[in-house]
Amino acid sequence: DMEKRLKPGTGANKKFLIDQKITPVFGKIPLNDIKPTDIRKWQNELTSYRDEKGNPYSATYLKTINNQITAIFNYAVKYYGLKENPCHKAGGMGKKNAEEMEFWTRDEFNTFIKYFEDKPKYYAMFMTLYYTGIREGEMLALTPADIDLEKATIRINKNYQNVNGEELITS
């Protein structure tokens, strides 16, 4: 029943995690039969996963998955009388803070932007992204009304998302 309280992109992300990472393992087991040892086994499988290039899931992605299953059990405790959340006894997985981001130096950016000097639309877009630090979705949601050339300001108050093939602008 949380769908109405979430932005479409957030809801789609949560649904994906539930459908791909939680339901295949726990979907047919009653919640009150899931034990902390089951959660630990599942966590260990996720932390051991490697893709075809040998890369594991990032620590922040693991934390996001773990937060989702913890929230499901918290909801069951609060609204459906589940005695306790097995995730609390199992412990956490992953880490909250993302890896430190790497940024281009001005020289690196100048090398990159030279390729777009004859493409004004892309040149303006990449210059704006680099010098403001806005995200791609925020950039794609901008309208002419958001830009005040006299005050040299850009109002960033919405985000572009593609959710299940549907293009959305969210605030």
Tell me what each language-model feature is.
Residues 17, 45-48, 68, 114-118, ...:
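Residues within well-ordered alpha-helical secondary structure of globular protein domains
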Residues 31, 87-90, 168-171:
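Short clusters of hydrophobic/aromatic residues that line enzyme substrate/ligand-binding pockets
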Residues 55-59, 63, 78, 82-142, ...:
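Basic, Lys/Arg- and aromatic-enriched nucleic-acid-binding interface segment
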Residues 98, 164-171:
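C-terminal catalytic core of Y-nucleophile DNA break-rejoin enzymes
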Residues 157-158:
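Radical SAM [4Fe-4S] cluster-binding motif and immediate context
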